[in-house]
Amino acid sequence: MDFIDEVKLYLKAGDGGDGCVSFRREKFVEFGGPNGGNGGKGGNIVFVSDANLNTLLNFRYRRHVKAGSGKSGASRDRSGTAGKNIVLKVPVGTQIIDEESEKIILDFNKPDMEFLIAQGGKGGLGNTNFKSSINRAPRHFTCGQFGEEKYVVLKLKVLSDVGIIGMPNAGKSKFLTRCSNADTKVGDYPFTTIKPHLGVAKVDNSEVVIVDIPGIITDAHLGIGLGHKFLKHVERCKILLHLIDVTHDNVVSAYNCMRNELELYNSDLVKKEEIIVLNKCDLLRKVEIFEKKNHLANYLNKEVLCLSIGEDLQPILRLLNEKLKKGSSKKVDVYDPFKR
C-alpha cells in the first residue's frame, strides 16, 4: 500500500439556500398573506481522527472537497433541505495547516477527535419573515450566505512506539519484515526503502508499533536525499532503534552522521531514548565485531547490541517493550485543543 503523508486540499462548505417569495393562493382567500419558506443551511466539512488509518491515501485523487449546498425555500412556508455534511477521516498524528499563514490549525494527537474546519452558510429568509402591520404583502427575501472556503495542507507524522533509524542499507527493512506483519521491500542496495513502513511486532502478550524510516544521509536536514521528507516521523516515536551496518569502515562516523542530522533537523530528537544495534554481524569475524562494538561503546559510554541477519529478534523486542512500559508510567503532558 502506498504511503502518502502530505496533501494539499481545497475545502468549500455548502452555500445556504435562498429564501422564497410566495403568497397564499387559495380559494375564498382574497388577500392571502406571505408564505415563502427559508433556505436550507449549507453543509459543513468536518475532520475526524481514525485510529484504523495510517496514511493519507484517501486523498490521493481527492484534492477538492465540497459540501452540499442548501436548497431554496418553497411556498407554504416550506424550508429548503439542508446541504449534506462531509466527514473526512484522517489518521491519528495528522496536522491541519493553513496554507496561507502556515500555522497549525489542529494536531490530531488522539483517536476520535472531531474538528469543524469549514462552516456551511446560513439559509436565506423567506418573505414570511418580513410581514408586518404596515407591510402585509412583503416581496423581500434574503439570499443564502456563502459557505467557508479555504486551502489547507494535511501533514501526517506517524505515531509509533519505535522508530528504526540508520544510514541507507543498514538493514532496517529486513528487521521490520522479520519482526512484524509489514510488507516491505528488501534489497542489498541503498535507498531500497523510499517511504515509511509501519509494522506491529508481537512481544509476549503485548504489541509494539514500529516504523521504518527511509535511510538518512549527510545534509538530510537540508533536503538532500530522502531523509528530510521523513525526518518528521521520528518526532512522534517514543524510542529510536538505531541500526548501524557493522561492515561500515567507521561505525563511530556512521553513528555521528545520523545523530547530527537528527539534531540539525530538531534538537529534541537526540533527547529521545535510543537503543544502538550493530547489524549484519554474520558478515564479519567475531574478532572484528568485538573490536568495533567496544570502540563504539567506549566512545558513547553506552551499551551497544549486536545482531546477525538470522538471529532471534525477541530479546531486542522485549528490551524495547520494557522501555516502552517504563516510559508509559511517566506522566506526559499532551496538548488537548478541546480542553478548556
Swiss-Prot record:
Binding site for GTP: 166-173, 191-195, 212-215, 279-282, 310-312
Signal sequence, renumbered to the chain: none
Listed GO CC annotations: cytoplasm
UniProt subcellular location: Cytoplasm
Pfam families: GTP1_OBG, MMR_HSR1
Protein residues bound to Mg(2+): S173, T193
Keyword Calcium found: no
Protein's GO biological process: ribosome biogenesis
CDD domains: Obg (cd01898)
PANTHER family: DEVELOPMENTALLY REGULATED GTP-BINDING PROTEIN-RELATED (PTHR11702), MITOCHONDRIAL RIBOSOME-ASSOCIATED GTPASE 2 (PTHR11702:SF31)
Oligomeric form and interacting partners: Monomer.
Family assignment from sequence similarity: Belongs to the TRAFAC class OBG-HflX-like GTPase superfamily. OBG GTPase family.
Protein known as: GTPase Obg
Organism (species): Wolbachia sp. subsp. Brugia malayi (strain TRS)
Species lineage: Bacteria, Pseudomonadati, Pseudomonadota, Alphaproteobacteria, Rickettsiales
